[in-house]
Amino acid sequence: MPGDASAICTLFEGDYHIALAAFINSLHTHGYRGSVWVGYRGPLPPWARGVVAHDGVSGFEAAAGLTVNFVLVETKRDLTNFKPDFLIDARRRFFPDAKSVFYFDTDIVLKCAWPFFEEWTSYGVALCEDINSPMPSTHPLRARWRRFYTPSGFSVARDLDVFLNGGFVGVTGADWEFVETWKRLLDLAEAAMDTLPEIRDRRHLFDKQDQDTLNLAAMFCTRPVSIAGKDGMDIVPGGFLMSHALGDSKTWRKNFLGEALRGYPPTSADRQFFQHTRGPLRAFSPATDRWKRLNLSAACAVARFYSRH
């Protein structure tokens, strides 16, 4: 059965359960059958019906062959900085024999048939370019990172000119060293945060700890990598893999029409998201879903005539 060789992980809290439903629906649409392991804080999603608790996991079948397992996480970290920890702990406890393990941010939806993702990991650690790419190998931030980590025994295994998005990684058991390296780098970064200058912009050594250290893992770890471009997350047109709702203005919170009237049209990620809100899991109530779709349609109509871009 497709998906049996893989395990998928994600993390959520708060209203990200809306995005989580759409993400899981997109997995189902594109053929994934297997388990989704969800680390969470706070209450379970309202759409998680018939959940059965066993051995520290609360699970239910979202659709035939697709199981969602909720794992309560206890950490003081921001969940975005808990990604490698969750991957390592979940693999050890729940799926030690999985051929491929994937992490996706919940605000991603798939556009591509699932078997391609499994094939992708056979070429190396699967990664995607970020909106802030490129970042040349000679960039001063990379030089500062090298200086910071050299005393801890890290050295550059490959020069990178791209900057990677921290919302997705796919890795086989053979390349698991990459995830362990990511965790060590993130732990060292977090331990140093109190000693670093309080700078609230990209000059900070670790502006986004999870993402910066993922990039460092790609620099320092000797395992092969396979990197998709910005199109891999719909950051630029032409992609076929995923769509990622980047930034602070999240799709499920937007007033699309209001934004369109200010000159900001719906994004590709906005439109892709609403292809996956109705099933097998209901991201919204039926009334809310209808209203948001009308709002999105009106915004798309306005955007044909008015945009800042």
Residue ranges and their predicted role:
Residues 1-4, 156-159, 177-309:
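A glycosyltransferase accessory/donor-loop signature
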Residues 1-78, 92-97, 285-309:
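N-terminal anchoring/stem segment of glycosyltransferases
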Residues 15, 43-44, 108-110, 132-134, ...:
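Short, solvent-exposed loop/turn segments at secondary-structure junctions
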Residues 20, 80, 84, 166, ...:
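Conserved glycosyltransferase catalytic-site signature
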Residues 29-33, 92-100, 105, 172-179, ...:
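Secondary-structure boundary elements
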Residues 37-39, 100-105, 110, 127, ...:
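A structural signal for short, well-ordered beta-strand segments and their strand-loop junctions
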Residues 84-136:
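GT-A fold catalytic core of metal-dependent nucleotide-sugar glycosyltransferases
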Residues 114-184:
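Conserved catalytic core of nucleotide-sugar-dependent glycosyltransferases
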